[in-house]
A protein has these predicted regions:
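Helix-start/capping segments and mature chain N-termini
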Residues: 1-50, 54-57, 61-200
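A short, hydrophobic C-terminal helix/tail in secreted or cell-surface proteins
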Residues: 201-206
Length: 206
């Protein structure tokens, strides 16, 4: 198992870098991974210097012994995403849910839609498989409360810290009704793409 961070590298600049550093640092401490703070900063500096032109998806991985590696990928244009609701699998280790690790099997799906929007057994809307969820209702922006039941994303925390997003829980039946009646809009939020409109597909009754 590795820890990893997915970031946007934009002409040598990484948005929300401090949030990514804080998350991987905290997770490494919780999980007993070696993590050299000075080495991380030098490692990231070298990446930014080497790749000062172009826009990339940057994936940085950390193993238990403290070794860092990185990969760069293009970022495809994606004006919006499609998603469907899926109930969270049972008996998932909270460590896996709340830390960004390479143990991601619980998020796999058949990609009939681009994304899945996960809810728990109580019906609470949680997160997308590749980011958090932001819900626009009237002139307010909301994201579910964090209670150790999802991955706390860097973009999510940044928006909360800026006072742009309010924590509020939505539950599935009310959520679906508000989607059907166009009372809410749904967005994927993550540090790579910032904010992306998401079209939610609801099952039709036969």
């Amino acid at each position: 198992m590795h820890l990893f961070e997915t970031m946007k590298l934009d002409k040598g600049f990484i948005p929300r870098l401090d949030y990514h550093y804080q998350r991987i640092s905290t997770s490494s401490e919780h999980l007993g991974f070696q993590f050299d703070h000075l080495f991380w900063k030098q490692f990231i500096h070298n990446i930014k210097t080497l790749h000062s032109k172009g826009v990339f998806r940057l994936k940085v991985t950390l193993n238990k012994e403290g070794e860092l590696n990185y990969e760069l990928f293009p970022i495809p244009d994606k004006p919006f995403f499609t998603a469907r609701l899926v109930q969270q699998k049972k008996n998932i280790d909270k460590v896996i849910i709340t830390n960004k690790t390479t143990e991601r099997d619980y998020l796999t799906h058949n990609h009939f839609t681009d994304l899945i929007l996960i809810y728990d057994e109580d019906g609470k809307i949680l997160e997308f498989d590749i980011g958090n969820v932001m819900i626009q209702e009237r002139d307010k922006l909301y994201t579910p409360t964090y209670k150790g039941d999802m991955l706390p994303g860097c973009m999510r925390q940044s928006l909360i810290d800026q006072g742009k997003v309010i924590e509020k829980d939505f539950y599935i039946e009310e959520f679906k009704e508000k989607i059907k009646s166009s009372q809410i809009n749904v967005y994927l939020i993550n540090s790579l793409r910032a904010v992306s409109y998401t079209h939610l597909t609801l099952p039709t009754k036969r």
